UniProtKB/Swiss-Prot annotation:
Cited SMART domains: DEP, PDZ
Job description of the protein: Negative regulator of the mTORC1 and mTORC2 complexes: inhibits the protein kinase activity of MTOR, thereby inactivating both complexes. DEPTOR inhibits mTORC1 and mTORC2 to induce autophagy. In contrast to AKT1S1/PRAS40, only partially inhibits mTORC1 activity.
Listed result of changing S293A: In mutant 13A; abolished phosphorylation, leading to promote interaction with MTOR without affecting ability to bind phosphatidic acid. Reduced ubiquitination by the SCF(BTRC) complex
Modified residues (Phosphothreonine): T241, T259, T295
Residues recorded as bearing Phosphotyrosine in the entry: Y289
Taxonomic lineage from the root: Eukaryota, Metazoa, Chordata, Craniata, Vertebrata
Annotated region (Disordered), positions in chain: 1-25
The protein's name in its UniProt record: DEP domain-containing mTOR-interacting protein
Cell wall biogenesis/degradation listed as a keyword: no
Residues recorded with modification N-acetylmethionine: M1
Post-translational note: Phosphorylation weakens interaction with MTOR within mTORC1 and mTORC2. Phosphorylated at Ser-286, Ser-287 and Ser-291 in response to mitogenic stimulation by MTOR: DEPTOR is either directly phosphorylated by MTOR or indirectly via proteins kinases that are activated by MTOR, such as CK1/CSNK1A1. Phosphorylation at Ser-286, Ser-287 and Ser-291 promotes ubiquitination by the SCF(BTRC) complex, followed by degradation. Phosphorylation at Ser-235 by MAPK3/ERK1 promotes deubiquitination by USP7, enhancing its stability.
Activity regulation, free text: Inhibited upon phosphatidic acid-binding: phosphatidic acid produced upon mitogenic stimulation promotes DEPTOR dissociatiom from the mTORC1 and mTORC2 complexes, leading to their activation. Specifically binds unsaturated phosphatidic acid, such as 16:0-18:1, 18:0-18:1 and di-18:1. Inhibited when nutrients are present via a feedback loop: phosphorylation by MTOR promotes DEPTOR ubiquitination and degradation.
Effect of R225A: Decreased phosphatidic acid-binding
Residue stretches making up the PDZ domain: 330-407
Amino acid sequence: MEEGGSTGSAGSDSSTSGSGGAQQRELERMAEVLVTGEQLRLRLHEEKVIKDRRHHLKTYPNCFVAKELIDWLIEHKEASDRETAIKLMQKLADRGIIHHVCDEHKEFKDVKLFYRFRKDDGTFPLDNEVKAFMRGQRLYEKLMSPENTLLQPREEEGVKYERTFMASEFLDWLVQEGEATTRKEAEQLCHRLMEHGIIQHVSNKHPFVDSNLLYQFRMNFRRRRRLMELLNEKSPSSQETHDSPFCLRKQSHDNRKSTSFMSVSPSKEIKIVSAVRRSSMSSCGSSGYFSSSPTLSSSPPVLCNPKSVLKRPVTSEELLTPGAPYARKTFTIVGDAVGWGFVVRGSKPCHIQAVDPSGPAAAAGMKVCQFVVSVNGLNVLHVDYRTVSNLILTGPRTIVMEVMEELEC
């Protein structure tokens, strides 16, 4: 993670030492592994290393073969040799990011066994730390959209800091964007983000306070990670020098160029999609879920459609035919701290591809195979799922959805 920018000892206190410091480093480490794993997952989908595979007449969706992946990692210079590749993938397995498809092997082996990213089968564990990390990542992506101007260079106590937000303005924005219903709720969210090391005061001197104090995100979620970084036991913040174009740092009143978050796009840059509930909403996994905040990335997401859950294709005309065997239902779904908990796929009409059984959508009565008629009063029968996705993700936290359900379904 990038420090909010101090090059000296200013702002260091007891909160960064002892057990608190160790806990903070572990949270930083976890966050880096999560981002690295997600970037690898998207890349493997893009290059078709992850795909449906068959063994003994059974199909295993969204899998990769361990031996083939090791070949791929070496070929793409993500690992120097097979032993190193095994160690790297074991790091992801130890964090619960990947697993053997039948959970028969805890060790990652250089053999023809099927493994899968847990985000691709909906089994990724969502503890409080992961939830806070995902929420922070979504807010970061939203703030980094071209039309958002909340993050600005600002000065505090005579020192200039890059990519800062003012606490009071950030709280206003959270309520305005539907991320929180009240200012108090927004402030509680900021306290959680700070406790989990996602945001910090620019000089690390203050907790989060509704004031004109300046804060920054500690992590550049968009930085392209190298898999080899997983073997580096140093604090993630030490992996980026002050000369890095991705490094958040404070600037004095000299004429040094600001190198904070320059738009550097390496070849084959991974397009990170941060709108997630157990899986990226536009990823290949059939268990991706809508997040409670939009993805407004300037880059198109990596797209890859899972097999449809529908038994047969259905047209909008068929749904609207008088006497057709479909019943209309309306749901009001309030997003929780993680999201709404469902996936839309298909086109003209879209359908519900997956529903998180523990999410708000399931609680409201949503089921797979239902067809989406309208979102917040807007008819969407004749658009594709990308349009519906954008409508949901850029709308309010509470959504009203009308669906049609086949009576025999």
